[in-house]
Amino acid sequence: MTASLWQQCLNRLQDELPSAEFSMWIRPLQAELSDNTLTLYAPNRFVLDWVRDKYLIRVNGIINELCGVDGPTLRFDIGNRPHPVAIARAPARGAAPVNNLQKSWESKADAKPEPNHKSNTNVNYTFENFVEGKSNQLARAAARQVADNPGGAYNPLFLYGGTGLGKTHLLHAVGNAIKERKKDAKVIYMHSERFVQDMVKALQNNAIEEFKRYYRSVDALLIDDIQFFANKERSQEEFFHTFNALLEGNQQIILTSDRYPKEINGVEDRLKSRFGWGLTVAIEPPELETRVAILMRKADENQIHLPDEVAFFIAKRLRSNVRELEGALNRVIANANFTGRAINIDFVREALRDLLALQEKLVTIDNIQKTVAEYYKIKLADLLSKRRSRSVARPRQLAMALAKELTNHSLPEIGDAFGGREHTTVLHACRKIEQLKEESHDIKEDYSNLIRTLSS
């Protein structure tokens, strides 16, 4: 009964949730039915709290649909069912029970660390000073779990997204958290080009065996911008074997890229396939509230009072990435220090006038319409027409939502630009896209791709 009921729940959840979300939160759960109580076991407190907070109502609803009023009561606990049941239809390749991997990793604590391994993570990047929002919530949660259970939670963890969105911050945060938990952990952070350089140097010095031993004896290997392996066949060959060795040893691998693994050109298919063995999570451009929070956090760190209206003014006009936001605020702070003037909207307009002018020039409604039409391979005239077929209506709604997000035009102005539509039509389109971004991985991916294109 347990296997049958929970398997049906799993099948429903796998159909309804994005694959990354399902793999991260639902797949690790184990189920046990006793005395008309269905107990779901989570591997740790973090997962338990998240699942109970985010999925309790959804799972209860599925159970009620399947069993009616006589369905079992749902409860949560931490631990492992003695005989795990009910796996998802397509379990992650290479996955193993979390508790076994955790014990394996922790058993290395008594091993004498090799003296030539020196952690090079930046201690200034932590989970505590990473500003969380809807755009990066899943990535941060995955990174946090990996830090708590290296080699066991998600291996490899693959984070992808545009420049300046926080991927590197999370890499360092994981490394620092692992080191804090296990002082002698061998954690190596590097850019992919450094791996290539080290390998070339090892080949030149006839020291390839030392190179292999070094990289295959770490507890956690954190590699940034893996797309730079493209067209470097010898480096890919060596990393392929290093990857396999680390995975077999339950040693953690975290990779980042500016694009989804399968979209990385010039990288062998066997590597791209392995990149997806664990968990792949996107980091999206930050939404308005997160951009404001980032600015306020940065101002606090610099002991600068940033009025709310100023933070919103900057955040509404600079949308592409965190690095751009922080750079703009640094310029505002520097100008305020040099001139002794108060930070207000007029002052910010002056301090950032070239940056704001460039942003407004880059992102126009006309530019958005052309970009969306090209992205979906439809005619611009159709996008602006009265046609209601889904192949045209959905891109039109996306374009309207992007215009509201990326420009300072009012809803009536946006409606006029889309063939004289009412502002209520634009508002409906924006709300519909927000809903679809929660429900459809494809829509969420398209929206993020378009924002990256328009903001680059």
From Swiss-Prot:
Residues 1-83 are annotated as: Domain I, interacts with DnaA modulators. CDD domains: AAA, Bac_DnaA_C. Gene3D superfamilies: 1.10.1750.10, 1.10.8.60, 3.30.300.180, P-loop containing nucleotide triphosphate hydrolases. Residues 120-336 are annotated as: Domain III, AAA+ region. It comes from the Bacteria. GO terms for molecular function: ATP binding; ATP hydrolysis activity; DNA replication origin binding; lipid binding. The keyword Nucleotide-binding applies. It is found in: Cytoplasm. Its main location: cytoplasm. ATP binds at G164, G166, K167, T168. One of its GO terms (cellular component) is plasma membrane. Disulfide bonds: none annotated. Pfam families: Bac_DnaA, Bac_DnaA_C, DnaA_N. PANTHER family: CHROMOSOMAL REPLICATION INITIATOR PROTEIN DNAA. Plays an essential role in the initiation and regulation of chromosomal replication. ATP-DnaA binds to the origin of replication (oriC) to initiate formation of the DNA replication initiation complex once per cell cycle. Binds the DnaA box (a 9 base pair repeat at the origin) and separates the double-stranded (ds)DNA. Forms a right-handed helical filament on oriC DNA; dsDNA binds to the exterior of the filament while single-stranded (ss)DNA is stabiized in the filament's interior. HAMAP family: DnaA_bact. This is Chromosomal replication initiator protein DnaA. It comes from Aeromonas salmonicida (strain A449).
